[in-house]
């Protein structure tokens, strides 16, 4: 069937996101995986940035991933806390939304999700990259969307969402 999830982003709440957002989010590490959920208070409260934070959260599109929390954080089967595992047996169903800050239509599609990457799969890295797979078993089979505007294709079998760990805060950079 057609994907039906709908995500709402409240920028004031994102800005003040704590270490323990509640619900099914983990309250500490799972399987040794470092979990880093809060916004960095040193940036959020910095006089140079604090008045820009909410508008900055709306400057670029947002990708929203909705799935059963166990698909990510379950100690035995969660892909995020078992990130070094590879292959189709480590793919989980999810709903993926593209939310454009200007209100123009994005996309909303059911897909498979895996962890991607090499060294960044290690549990010392708190942010992992995702790969989304668009297949008939999840719904439409392909993503048909002008993701890059007039440049390139509008049809996708998969998309990678990279984290760029080199020279990042997570890698001492």
Where on the chain are the PLM-derived regions?
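Phosphate-handling architecture centered on phosphoinositide signaling
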Residues: 2-173
